[in-house]
């Protein structure tokens, strides 16, 4: 049986980290694509040379030609410009939309049967545009946001409660931006809801509110510290979890930017919701009950995403079809 083929479109910091993780987890052969000559080839060779030490067998091909991704089982898209200090994800819209048009055409031509995971920001608008540019089924084009946002939320909660991250579940809905909605009452430590832990005296509501805000600012915090780029380790790990769920038909419940068509009162939009990911791609969207406060926060988040998608349509009229 042939190994899976995983195409990484964009060979920057996330792309290189993704390639290494694919090797370490033995998920398949890797094609690293980038428009910059030498970068994907150099990173591919460097990672391949770690294989004898780490003990994995996989091919790593660096390329500047979309033809090399032909027949890929999974495409993970990181191509585009990352954030710099002081920038919001939304500031990248015009530049990265043009990149998505090129990437969409490449995937449409060479990997129409792939499961596509988009990481490029502003995430919710870029994955919406990528699906339209590529013409792939909506179930097979998703955005990596919720896994990362939830991971940050879980890490901060684990630090606050001084417990293992493995025992913390965290729930984040909505767009991947300042309006994301971390849901406290659906987040737990070993099954105990966070509001109960507040009542038990483990923490205060004020500290939980601070953690919620830090989660919203999670990406900006790292951008501010790095000063010359954005996060790449945790985003790469998050995308790999999604790819693994698809390749191994794990039916994992993962929050991601999925195409919503009626659920949560939203139509024809990509926004962060809990999903089941298996061999069929996004096989199900889980619709949970929101209270009035949560619903209002979610609607604000959706409105923000709608605004970005409208802006995309103004730049590229073909997206309005």
UniProtKB/Swiss-Prot annotation:
Catalytic EC class: oxidoreductase
Record field: catalytic activity: (S)-malate + NAD(+) = oxaloacetate + NADH + H(+)
GO BP of this protein: lactate metabolic process; tricarboxylic acid cycle
InterPro entries xref list: L-lactate/malate_DH, Lactate/malate_DH_C, Lactate/malate_DH_N, Lactate_DH/Glyco_Ohase_4_C, Malate_DH_type3, NAD(P)-bd_dom_sf
Transcription regulation found in the keyword field: no
UniProt GO molecular function: L-lactate dehydrogenase activity; L-malate dehydrogenase (NAD+) activity
EC number: 1.1.1.37
Superkingdom of source: Bacteria
Active site residues per record: 176
Disulfide feature: none
Family matches, as SUPFAM superfamilies: LDH C-terminal domain-like, NAD(P)-binding Rossmann-fold domains
Binding residues for NAD(+): 10-15, 34, 96, 119-121
Residues noted as binding substrate in the record, renumbered to the chain: 83, 89, 121, 152
Record flagged with keyword NAD: yes
Record keywords: NAD, Oxidoreductase, Tricarboxylic acid cycle
Functional note: Catalyzes the reversible oxidation of malate to oxaloacetate.
Family: Belongs to the LDH/MDH superfamily. MDH type 3 family.
Protein name: Malate dehydrogenase
Lineage: Bacteria, Pseudomonadati, Pseudomonadota, Alphaproteobacteria, Hyphomicrobiales
Gene name tied to this protein: mdh
